[in-house]
Structures are given as C-alpha cells and as structure tokens.
Amino acid sequence: MDIVRSPISTLNHIYEISGVEVGQHFYWQIGGFQVHGQVLLTSWVVIAVLLGSATIAVRDPQTIPTGGQNFVEYILEFFRDLTRTQIGEEEYGPWVPFIGTMFLFIFVSNWSGALLPWGILKLPQGELAAPTNDINTTVALALLTSVAYFYAGLTKKGLGYFGKYIQPTPILLPINILEDFTKPLSLSFRLFGNILADELVVAVLVSLVPLIVPIPVMFLGLFTSGIQALIFATLAAAYIGESMEGHH
C-alpha cells in the first residue's frame, strides 16, 4: 500500500506546483473600465514607503550631514552622476528628479515582491505581488519614458527634432520610426519578464523544498531586481540624452 501511495502523493505534489498561476487578477470596476486592483494596492504601498522615507530623511536637515541624511545625499549624488553621464553636463539638471523617481519606484517595487509577505493577504481572485510583476505597470513606465524623450527632443530642437528620422539618409525612415516603437517594448518586457520569472522560480522552489534551497535564489532575485532598476533608469536617461543631442 505504501508503494502505491508514494507515487500518488508525488503526483499530488506536482499537481500543486502546477497550480502556480500567471495572469490571475483582482479586478475593480471603475466606470466602464476594469482595472487590476492588486496592482493599484501594491503600488500605493510602494509610493507610501517612498514618501514616508523621504519625509523622515529631510525633516531635520543638517549643514553637516550624518546618518540617514548622509545616505540620502549619497543616493542623490548617484542619480545626478547617472543622469549627467547619459544626458550631458549642460542638460542633465532638470531630468535628475525624473530618473531618480523612476529608479526608486522600480527598485522598491521589485524588492517588495521578495521582501514583503504579500501572500498573507488574501484576495477574492489573484494574489498580491510586486507592481512590476504586472505588464500594465511596466508598459506604463516605458510609455512615460517615451513621452519624456519626445518632450525633451521637441523642447530642445522644436520641429527640427523630426529631422532625425531621415538621418543619415531618408532610406532609413521606416527603420528610425520602428526604433521609437521598439524602445518602450524592450523596456517594458525586459523588466516584466525578469521580475515575473524570479517570483515564479521562488514559488516553485518553495513548493518543492520549503527550507534553505530557496534562500540563495531569493538573494539572487534581490540582486537582479536592483540591476533591472538600474538598467531601466540608465536606458531612460540615455534615450532622453539621445533625443536632445542626436548622438549616443
């Protein structure tokens, strides 16, 4: 009997692992539209964490920074250097807040999926996860980046900005137009795919071996999440710099 039960229990366990689902959503009906409620909830948590941290960090600024203020100034310096490197010495200033906000939102969103126990909170449908685990979030961030670099180019060059589409030769017009469509696609799918894959791998490993084994993968996921935030922010700054200078 035990010999028969063993394969059956193994099959049941495999069936439970196969229950790890993708694309299950908790919908809110707003007007005539359905929105992903769990994405809004987790995004609000991330925004609250960022606003709360910023408020605490700057509530009592000192002339000689110490502790938390010193750490915040180090982060701001990092954003400034990143933006200046990609956009250029003369134009980078106004774009530091945008690039910094992009990096922080993506970074905290990615880490929230690994560090916060979203699974404790049960929803009627779907489950809570990192905001960047949803393709709608990453597409929105990518489209916001596209709007930013079009705005930067038009502000700097006016209608002459569109002359880049026929450079260095008008034959490349279709390819240059296609490039502007592939930029947001690559930004959104790269971020979404990496975060989703990381959470699925951890979920499967926890189902197979609940102790010890998933821990190194979780640490690797934290590292990957930080790298993805850096890649997104760097590319966003590079696209903005390219739209203003025409050479990157």
UniProtKB/Swiss-Prot annotation:
Record-linked CDD domains: ATP-synt_Fo_a_6
Keywords: ATP synthesis, CF(0), Chloroplast, Hydrogen ion transport, Ion transport, Membrane, Plastid, Thylakoid, Transmembrane, Transmembrane helix, Transport
Transmembrane segments: 38-58, 96-116, 135-155, 200-220, 221-241
Domain of life, per lineage: Eukaryota
Entries under PROSITE patterns matching the protein: ATPASE_A (PS00449)
Gene Ontology MF term list: proton-transporting ATP synthase activity, rotational mechanism
SUPFAM superfamilies per the UniProt record, alphabetical: F1F0 ATP synthase subunit A
Protein family (similarity comment): Belongs to the ATPase A chain family.
Designated name of the protein: ATP synthase subunit a, chloroplastic
Native organism taxonomy: Eukaryota, Viridiplantae, Streptophyta, Embryophyta, Tracheophyta
Name of the coding gene: atpI
